[in-house]
Amino acid sequence: LDMVMLDIRMPYSEVLKYDVGSRPSEVWPEKACVKTVKPLASDLIDFVENYVKEKGLSPVRYNIEIKSKDAKGEGQNWPTYDRFVSECCKFLHSKHLGDRLVVQSFDVRALNYMHEKYPEFILSYLVDAKAGEFDAFMAKLKFTPQWLSPHFSITDEALVQKCREKGMKIVPWTPDKPEDLQRMVDLGVDAIITNYPDRLLMITRGYAAPAP
């Protein structure tokens, strides 16, 4: 099947014209439908920081993903991983988040480059359900990251123990069902990435956050 590649890149002034929050989702039927636009990362962080300060809340921690990919089109349809990492780090430095920021990625090239060029950042290694043996996927890195973030389906007592032995925190993604969230909590993981933080709050604290 012949496919036509369309250039859909738009300036942010055009992106702002589109409501991306009002339409219900078949995939996420419990999603709150709120009229909104896609924010710039800088605007989002500024909003959160100002809100927390105004309300006298505890500082927020950020987990931001570097989405680079070793595939045909890199350097043409999207930036090379090293250029992209450098631009992201320049931006992140400007926000002065310190140890409240963790940068995660599946791309071992990006993680290795970032560790070498920007060692001040806390890094998290994302691995999927088909990552294979612990020693094999860890060998792809030239260093031991502060965090390991495996798919929840491969997260078990043995993996938690290996992370402890390596001095890494373990932060599985993305359990959404209550029973999967409960299993992660029972394993004693350090944090959990989920699309349903309200369900996690109900398990860990006995209450859910109010609806927006």
Model-derived regions, located:
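Metal-dependent phosphodiesterase/phospholipase catalytic core, i.e.
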Residues: L1-V108, N112-I122, F143-T144, P150, ...
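C-terminal active-site rim and adjoining tail of enzyme catalytic domains
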Residues: F121-P212
